[in-house]
Amino acid sequence: VWNDYINGKTIMAVIIHTPEEIEKMRELGKLVAEALDYIGDFVKPGITTNELDKLVYDYHVNVQGGYPAPLHYGNPPYPKSCCTSVNHVICHGIPDDKPLKEGDIINIDLTIKKDGFHGDSSRMFTVGKVSPQAQRLIDVTHESMMAGIAAVKVGATLGDIGYACQNVAENAGYSVVQEFCGHGIGRDFHCEPQILHYGRKGQGMVLKAGMIFTIEPMINQGKRHLRILDDGWTVVTKDRKLSAQWEHEVLVTETGCEILTISPRTGKA
């Protein structure tokens, strides 16, 4: 989601979820993780992202009994059911008829809406065999996300999360996208707090039990600078070098945090 801090927008109150809401969010987190397990099996050379998108729509609606939240979201209305960001696309890549090819890397970002709640997660997938450089970017980006998640606990700050993500990425020689960030989630697709993937320890909002938000660092192989294409959605690296992203939904608990979007198939984050 767009980083509103850059634009000086007024930040609204953060929701502390009730036990009943938390249980629903666990259900939705499991659903979106199941959908990512499902769609990953189809990521192979020759398939188009449009074909993947149709599979996502069918799975969310006909198998899971929900609805793809990205479809018709925002302004201009997003035209598809998921985001498919290939190679130098940072985020919000719109599915199209171009076949994936051997060596591509792709982020698939899914959000399901059901019973008034949302589940949101994304993963990186490799198309056939990829270069060691591409695999390293994918691995470091996952490590960056997990470092951010490890910083989540009652009394920690948003700056602690951002610092942890940034530290991993920059120590590996990569850059962190600053214009887009994680977000609160629940009955709303996007709400407070905004989770920056860069920052200073001890700064920003203090975390409380019952908060639910995404941590989803976008890490570039080259410089952090980006541009948005004329479709109003697709975000690409300005230098056309590779970008990677992982996303999990996290609940702040009294004892630390709980990842709500772990893969049911592998049991891994």
Which residues fall in each region the model found?
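Active-site neighborhoods and metal-handling regions in enzymes and metal-associated proteins
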Residues: 2-269
